Each structure stands twice: as structure tokens, then as C-alpha cells.
Amino acid sequence: MKITWLGQAGLLFDNGKVKIMVDPYLSNSVEKVEPLNYRRVPVKEEFLSVSPDVMIFTHDHLDHYDPETAPIFLERKEKRMTVLSPSSVWQKARAFKAHNNVQFNRGTSWTEYGFRFTAVKAEHSDVHAIGVIIEDLMENKVYYITGDTLYNNRIFGDLPEKIDVIFLPINGVGNNMNETDAVRFFRACGARWAVPYHIGMFDGKTTDIFDDENKITLEIYKEREL
């Protein structure tokens, strides 16, 4: 699977046949509300032209369901996307009727294109926020995107025994884990590899603060095989 970090919590999964996009933030909309949270990373506009088969929004915050970025994808009608989002986002996304908008709350699974997607608990200020398990049924690989979350023991009951790669926030503000709790969470969930992210967009942090030998560091906009 080729994976590209789009900055903040944005991810693009591409196996050559199916494209899955998660939480794209490709604007500067947050700065308009919170001036200190301006982009430190420029938008790479080529990613606005990507045509995902599946779009996932984990919760209704500007840097995840972005009111400037999301409509660029949702207004297109040439291809019907599957859009997976919890109730807080689904209420907005379903206004774009060209796509299959699935209400994707905790405990819900959706199987399509050789993948199974399962919404799991996240502990965040948006009570509808979710994490997502992405199972590649052909390659027998499991990816876990925690979404924005704090360390909470109740999350672990939602998780599968096997996790190949976990993507988890380490910015430590806005009801997200800091690097210390993120390392604890990684080790507790039993994942093989950890990809720390949700940094560098509104701050000067790097993945160096995540101290574990099984860390994988992604560079923004650079594709990596995982």
C-alpha cells in the first residue's frame, strides 16, 4: 500500500486500484478562526485533483472536515464516492447527493473495494469523533487511524488483535495525546509500527519527540510503501 501524508491528519492510501482519502485539510480555513493557527506547510494543489473511491472524515473540526477542502471533492459528480463519516459530519456531507454518504458511527463496519472499514471509539471534544480500522482484505494488512483522541482505556476494547500500522496524533493540544501518551498508547494497542502525525501544520514540532524504535516517519506529500 502506498501512503501519502497530506499534512495534519490527512492521509491518502493508494494500492494502484483503489484510493482512500482521510481528513484532507488543503486550505487555510483554520487561520480565519484562530489566527495563530496558520499553515506552516503550503498546500500542494495536485492533491485537490485526486479522485478518491472512498473518503473518510473522522469528525467535525475544521482541520478534518474542512468547509473549504471537502466541497472540492464532494461537489464532483463524474464519479460516485463512498463517504464515511460520523453523525456530526454526515449531517453536512449528505447535502452533496452525488455520493453514497454512509453514517459511520462507532461500531459500524463497511466493506467495499476489497477493504473493510470499522469505526472505533475516539476520546475527543467532538463526541461523535471516531477512529478508523482499515483492513486490506487482499493483503491481510490492518491500518488503524486513531483520529483525534486522548489516551482512554475504553478504546482498546474496540480494536482488533492484529494492527500492522497505527497513525496517531502527538501534538498534545485540542484534546489530543501528547508524545508521551502516544507512545504509551502505541505499546498498549500492540501495533507493529507507529506513524506519529498531526504536527507541523500549526506548530514547529517534529516526529523526533515520539521516542520508540518502531516509529515510521512520513514526510508531508511524499509517498511511502507501508
Q: Language-model features: where?
A:
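Conserved beta-strand hairpin/beta-sheet module of binuclear metal-dependent hydrolase folds
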Residues: 1-45, 128-147, 165
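Short active-site oxyanion
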Residues: 1-2, 77-83, 141-143, 193
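Active-site environment of divalent metal-dependent phosphoester hydrolases
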Residues: 9, 28-29, 61-65, 90-93, ...
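Pre-active-site segment of Zn-dependent metallo-hydrolases
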Residues: 18-56, 60, 67-72, 149-161
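Active-site neighborhood of phospho(di)ester-bond hydrolases with catalytic His/Asp-centered motifs
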Residues: 22-23, 52-63, 83-87, 143-148, ...
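Active-site HxH/HxHxD metal-binding segment of metal-dependent hydrolases
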Residues: 42-109
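Binuclear metal-ion centers of metallo-dependent hydrolases, dominated by the metallo-beta-lactamase
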Residues: 82, 96-111, 154-162, 181-226
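Active-site-proximal loop/helix segments of hydrolase catalytic cores
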Residues: 123-188, 204
